[in-house]
Amino acid sequence: MQMLYWAQNDSGGTAMLGSFNPWKHYDNYSEQMFEDKTSDLPQWPIKLWQVPEVSPYFHHAHLLIAADCSAFACPSFHEKLSKGKVPLLCCPATDFDIATKLEKIFSHNEIASITVVKMEKACCQDMLEFIFRAAKVSRLPIPIQVTNLFVEAEDVTE
């Protein structure tokens, strides 16, 4: 990957000033590293408010219900928390009625398990209540595991 720098002269013409490769100083850098990456997402969309209430990807699914910001706070989020799960992202502080949407998803699909990832911040405190309420309404014995993330990106599992 190279960045090209162009400049416009007084007469309106342009000339290339040079190029710069911001990655050349990194050890073991290879453009192939980026080309070989593909998404492991089992579905799209991943935002809770956008997903349908009934879908084949929910059948016997291991759900990951995570706060929007959690993936950015934990460097190993994909490898340690979301791999092999159906991700549903939401923000308990700003999203619509999360509990109602989850109640419908849980009631209409056979959910195998739920992993909750939330930040240890005031804005995420209601997240567990929404999920437990939805699971209770669905009357299904869904195992729920909770992981709290701290801003320092240290994760602690309850």
Which functions belong to the PLM regions below?
Residues Q2-E158:
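Iron-sulfur-associated redox domains of electron-transfer enzymes in respiratory
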